[in-house]
Amino acid sequence: MMKEKSISASKASLVFFLCQMISALDVPLDSKLLEELSQPPTITQQSPKDYIVDPRENIVIQCEAKGKPPPSFSWTRNGTHFDIDKDAQVTMKPNSGTLVVNIMNGVKAEAYEGVYQCTARNERGAAISNNIVIRPSRSPLWTKEKLEPNHVREGDSLVLNCRPPVGLPPPIIFWMDNAFQRLPQSERVSQGLNGDLYFSNVQPEDTRVDYICYARFNHTQTIQQKQPISVKVFSTKPVTERPPVLLTPMGSTSNKVELRGNVLLLECIAAGLPTPVIRWIKEGGELPANRTFFENFKKTLKIIDVSEADSGNYKCTARNTLGSTHHVISVTVKAAPYWITAPRNLVLSPGEDGTLICRANGNPKPSISWLTNGVPIAIAPEDPSRKVDGDTIIFSAVQERSSAVYQCNASNEYGYLLANAFVNVLAEPPRILTPANKLYQVIADSPALIDCAYFGSPKPEIEWFRGVKGSILRGNEYVFHDNGTLEIPVAQKDSTGTYTCVARNKLGKTQNEVQLEVKDPTMIIKQPQYKVIQRSAQASFECVIKHDPTLIPTVIWLKDNNELPDDERFLVGKDNLTIMNVTDKDDGTYTCIVNTTLDSVSASAVLTVVAAPPTPAIIYARPNPPLDLELTGQLERSIELSWVPGEENNSPITNFVIEYEDGLHEPGVWHYQTEVPGSHTTVQLKLSPYVNYSFRVIAVNEIGRSQPSEPSEQYLTKSANPDENPSNVQGIGSEPDNLVITWESLKGFQSNGPGLQYKVSWRQKDVDDEWTSVVVANVSKYIVSGTPTFVPYEIKVQALNDLGYAPEPSEVIGHSGEDLPMVAPGNVQVHVINSTLAKVHWDPVPLKSVRGHLQGYKVYYWKVQSLSRRSKRHVEKKILTFRGNKTFGMLPGLEPYSSYKLNVRVVNGKGEGPASPDKVFKTPEGVPSPPSFLKITNPTLDSLTLEWGSPTHPNGVLTSYILKFQPINNTHELGPLVEIRIPANESSLILKNLNYSTRYKFYFNAQTSVGSGSQITEEAVTIMDEAGILRPAVGAGKVQPLYPRIRNVTTAAAETYANISWEYEGPDHANFYVEYGVAGSKEDWKKEIVNGSRSFFVLKGLTPGTAYKVRVGAEGLSGFRSSEDLFETGPAMASRQVDIATQGWFIGLMCAVALLILILLIVCFIRRNKGGKYPVKEKEDAHADPEIQPMKEDDGTFGEYRSLESDAEDHKPLKKGSRTPSDRTVKKEDSDDSLVDYGEGVNGQFNEDGSFIGQYSGKKEKEPAEGNESSEAPSPVNAMNSFV
């Protein structure tokens, strides 16, 4: 089965030889075939439909065609036969239909205006050209007019009318002053589309007498100017501000009709003070992205490539601080006919069927008419094999006499389309056009394309065989292209051999053998290495290669991607590069490139040059400056300078440096002139005209340079013509309609005389234009406006001064400004290579549509969704740029099993063109990522529970999970491996029948239909018994728990230290450690070692009032630790000199408080047993607010300090394993005294009469909390409540 595949650019020359019978545009252009096969005429070249000619030159109307036999040509003019033999001024080129009208003999071009049509005819039919309308261009003179000065009040608006003469085509308008400088434009002052100059408000600086409107007629390359306009602005104080008023267009609404594919230009210019700002919107829609541009300071809305969807109302609003105004332009987009399906040539064999289809669209809908051989089909000779059905012609059982050329005409009121398509009936046996025994050579592991170009009618079938009489080639390892080419995607060494192509149709068969050789790839087996070399040492890079013995390699060395310096220090050997006596300039990247006729490889290394170790040096002095400078032998262009050397200071003078000063152009600046050996004391100096010279001399020895000598006397040379022209002349457009010519100005001493100016000349290349020139001064740039977009120009810049011109300058080629590309790449195709790589192909855009320097193509691609999760996510577009005129590229890093979209855009120096339609493609499944986690819980005697999470990236449809596990003994030796396959919808598994007290290692991964993904590992241990019962130690009678445990970690905190205690169950002689840190901090845990096997430890040096986290661990016991605990140190005290706990009054007071609370509890208990009511008021009085107790927090005597012993006692009645924080703040669910219990929430514990229930029942597993959330210590009353 044939499979379509794009053909690389290197095979483009083969395309003309490939036969595509039904859709072919032509018979293959093989010279032998063309001598034998008949072919109807085909128009290959013709002049444009609307052809504007230069009236000063001969008129050339092109008409070229091909066919077999060669066609003859005839013309009509204005619908009637044009007999060129009767017009001596008209000739037809030999073997061509092109007409040449000679107007050099005084004949006016206007005499040949009209509508021309060419017919190319041979025995198989006739093809016709478009109707070519010939019109000579016109550039009439400006009408004479008397222009009155414009007197305008400051702040008023002003319009300077241009009204250029009506030309063909219309001229390009621009405003300049009498110095040929463009008038500056801004939001306030700008040129309208009609060429007029608009002032939103005038300012005093607008006063001038040289507002000049210029009209450039491109066809005749002439520029005409209007009489200068004078503007006088007079000031009035104060200046009156005005709201916006539209200067153009007038009124509140207007209409605009534009044709599809054209550029829509809408304009709004407003008057007002302050200057109004223009804003554009489309009512009921959005301005089209990527096609909308704002020009002329947003006064012009430009939409390129308009379509019917751009019809609608466009509103411009002008606004300033005093108000706003608006205008609505109703845009209607009509369309001249455009092709949906243009008719294509048919090559049929006798008896075959075929169709010609001609479908076009437009607005209004175009009408379709058919012609045959240039004659309307209704009056053409009948053909029984032909049936016309609207836009389709159906052919049935054609015969050789059915050959003809058919014309389809689609027309509406805005234009027409005319297409020729021939039907050529041929009966030809197969022919293979590829030369016999052609040799193809490729590198192993790369694609091999073996050609079998063919022709035949009917279309032959192609088969490939290995060898001369081998078996037919089939299978996925081969790709068969419709053009007959055989592709081996990955050629191997055993692919070498003979391949036979067989072409057959009903008229016969033929075959051809070709040879394929697969070569070993070229490799660099020893690459250059990074080097750090000291100055003056030697550096050597190796580049040892291995290559196919039948290929001849060439080795090239580069430095920083450029050729090696032309320096004898660089020695290139067979497989190495040696650099002698390295210097700092040798720093860089050195690349070895190996090329053969079939492949190329490279490798690079960096050379770093460092300073050599310092060596002791003998100190010498620099020479003294030279003396007694004298000028002799003065001539116009030379002079002799002599001097006396100064002292050498023990180091011989090696050379003298001569410098000069130009007192006329750059006084005070010294320039290098020349240098001579140290043995010379005179030198002949070359001079330039028009320079006031002074000279000085500097002596140089090995130590350095002397101070400069005293300057010589001055010498002024005579003026002369410039000797040279400006350098670095360039022409690059900054806008689509201009050409910016730049150059490097001559320096003052290069001017050779006063009055330095530049003659700037330009003309469009390949158009036979006259040179256009301007003379400018004191600038290095000139802007040519009104140029076509991106066309080549010949440019030259010549220097001149008051004495004359410099020599004729050389010409350079520049280009006018680029514009955004107009056309999107077509025929975008995606070939998915594997789950993470795809290849994208596209057809190159026409070079004319690029409208600039083609820089390459950009491919935008993004993931739409994962096919396994069906969930969209944030779209992150990626961009790959392919430089140059490439038509394919690779998309790496794709996610498997995902849906992607891409589009392609062409790029030039201006930016990106429109995007091609989005192309959707999908990547196949890949292997999944590892499961997101593996957790092992619930260890028992013989089982473990495994829980896991699905892979973060399934990369396909999960088919199963693979679990492997094996036991590990104490020496880390692995036991037998067990493998289990688990359904993909499971997320947990209970492994049973395991050995007790055994460590297992687990390996876990997921699978798709493609294969297994990466695995994660985990270890776990079964326990000896589920109750944690201790077992007797062998021979000792002692019992030890199977697993050591640390539990019931408690803390008692003071201001700067805390007592940590815990309970331990496990083997004797454990070594404990305590880890702690600030709660909520990301800092590492601090570690303290506990001496001996004690079960308590005092942490010292803590910060007062700080919350800490703490945990206890044991060394050498598989690194186990207790769970984390929290505590907080007490606030800092002003003084701690008196231990309050030892004071007698404190002890007495505490006893009295305890006794009072005990009495209250007894009374409450008695009243409750009697069932009596407990009024709320009495309860509130008895349960006084802690904040109004006599022992308040701020008296400095209670609540701030607790001994470690009392703190430890406070914790004893707590529920096992829990602890109340040192600030006595208890969570809501752990407190009986919370506001919820007092009725603030839905769980309040009140009786119907409002009395408290269970207020003093004293749930011992919970502690009461303070009524507020203060971090201060509690009052003694609350402390006693927690004790009861």
From Swiss-Prot:
Membrane-related topology note: Single-pass type I membrane protein
Extracellular side: 25-1143
Any coiled-coil regions, as ranges: none
InterPro entries found in the cross-reference section: FN3_dom (IPR003961), FN3_sf (IPR036116), Ig-like_dom (IPR007110), Ig-like_dom_sf (IPR036179), Ig-like_fold (IPR013783), Ig_I-set (IPR013098), Ig_sub (IPR003599), Ig_sub2 (IPR003598)
Biased composition regions of type Polar residues, renumbered to the chain: 707-731, 1268-1284
Region (Disordered): 707-732, 1175-1284
GO CC annotation, single: axon
Keywords assigned by UniProt, alphabetized: Cell adhesion, Cell membrane, Disulfide bond, Glycoprotein, Immunoglobulin domain, Membrane, Repeat, Signal, Transmembrane, Transmembrane helix
Single GO MF descriptor: cell adhesion molecule binding
Transmembrane segments: 1144-1166
An example Gene Ontology biological process: clustering of voltage-gated sodium channels
Cytoplasmic face residues: 1167-1284
Signal peptide: 1-24
Pfam families reported for this sequence: Bravo_FIGEY, fn3, I-set, Ig_3
Compositionally biased region (Basic and acidic residues): 1175-1195, 1202-1212, 1221-1230
Record localization: Cell membrane
Protein family: Belongs to the immunoglobulin superfamily. L1/neurofascin/NgCAM family.
Protein task: This protein is a cell adhesion molecule involved in neuron-neuron adhesion, neurite fasciculation, outgrowth of neurites, etc. Specifically involved in the development of optic fibres in the retina.
Protein's name in the database: Neuronal cell adhesion molecule
UniProt organism field: Gallus gallus
